[in-house]
Amino acid sequence: DDFALPAQLAPFNMLAASSAINEQNPRNFKFFMERMKWTINGNTWEPREATDRETVKLDTTEIWELVNSGGGMMGGGGMMGNGGMMGGKDEGGGMGNMMQMPHPIHIHQVQFNILERDTSAMDATVWNSIKEGFIDGGWQDTVLVMPGMKIKIIMRFEDFKGLFVYHCHNLEHEDMGMMRNYSI
């Protein structure tokens, strides 16, 4: 069979920040290593748990801020410098802070739009070498959060109530606890 893509894809409407019930106070989720465990806001996986911060109302739109605050366990730095895995310019390399790793964050049950990607806390050299590969337009269900990066996303919680998971899509991180429930 012959198949051709349409000349123009169907338009989509992004969610407006002004439609969020928490536009001025987004929920904050920090992804980091703490006490040798991959955590979200200091918590690890509990199969039937969702904290107040992880509880949303049906038929609402919210903004969440996802923060990759790096390692925490071994101090500052990063993979590329300041004592990080690759060492600094004058340091000769080393294993420093291997815990500052990218986290591809996947949120089940919803799709979202990316409102803002704050890279001000990232190493500028690293960001400038990778920024062309990021696609922030359209609907997403997973977003890559680099070390030092903050991302604001907006999503609508509709159709279903229940417990749904959100997690880092690095299997080792997910298996070590970087997965949580949110409740609608």
What are these language model-derived features?
Residues 112, 119-129:
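The feature marks short-to-medium sequence segments in extracytoplasmic or secretory-pathway proteins
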